[in-house]
Regions:
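Generic detector of short, locally flexible boundary/turn motifs and exposed helical patches
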Residues: 22-28, 38, 73-79, 104-109, ...
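Glycine-rich phosphate-binding P-loop
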Residues: 57-82
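Conserved nucleotide-sensing/catalytic segment adjacent to the nucleotide-binding pocket
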Residues: 83-150
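Hydrophobic, Leu/Ile/Phe/Ala-enriched alpha-helical segments that form helix-helix packing faces
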Residues: 43-51, 76-81, 129-134, 152
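Hydrophobic/aromatic beta-strand patches that form the interior of the parallel beta-sheet core
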Residues: 59, 85, 111, 159-164
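N-terminal pre-Walker A segment at the start of P-loop NTPase domains
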Residues: 17-54
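Long, mid-chain structured domain cores
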Residues: 1-25
Length: 177
């Protein structure tokens, strides 16, 4: 065996050792990572590693309904020892927040926004809260980022990571408008 180069392992390398395989990364877009439903454990670990990093991070998660997007975000937050807050969600019932209380403004929180719910919401206070949260130096996770960017000034280029979660490899992620 001949070594040609040594490098410090990245968190993707550590996850590959832990789970026995590398995370699939888009060849054309290096910030896009693909997972299947059977890989939820790997996805949760991946999110937890991202959530452990300090500072602003904007993560988008694409996927059809009932594939495990929200549950993975919450589980990743728990693994990273971070508190999670729904700004908008459909996990238990439809949640649309229009304000946060004093203790909920924290760089150590993970803010979860359902882009489909927020895109349909007409309450200006909710839209103002979303804008406020987007400026915080913390982690924001947007489900359905493609729908989210249709109704505000953000673009896909603003996202640091895009995660695609599918039932199976060939499932298409499509949205009805």
């Amino acid at each position: 065996i001949e070594r040609t180069k040594l490098r410090m392992p990245e968190f993707r390398d550590r996850l590959a050792v832990r789970h026995g395989r590398y995370i699939e990364q888009d060849a054309g877009d290096k910030k896009t990572f693909r997972f299947e439903r059977e890989d939820l454990g790997l996805l949760v670990d991946f999110l937890a590693e991202l959530f452990k990093e300090d500072g602003h991070k904007l993560i988008g998660i694409r996927g059809m309904p009932r594939v495990g997007k929200t549950e993975s975000i919450v589980a990743g937050s728990v693994c990273a020892h971070k508190r999670w807050l729904f700004i908008s969600s459909t996990l238990i019932k439809q949640t649309v927040r229009s304000s946060l209380i004093k203790g909920e403004y924290d760089a150590n929180h993970v803010y979860i926004i359902d882009g489909a719910v927020t895109a349909r919401e007409t309450n200006p206070k909710h839209q103002q809260l979303v804008e406020e949260v987007m400026t915080l130096p913390s982690i924001k996770v947007v489900e359905h980022p493609d729908l989210f960017i249709e109704t505000n000034q953000y673009s896909i280029d603003d996202f640091d990571y895009i995660i695609e979660l599918r039932e199976h490899e060939n499932q298409k992620i499509e949205y009805d408008h």
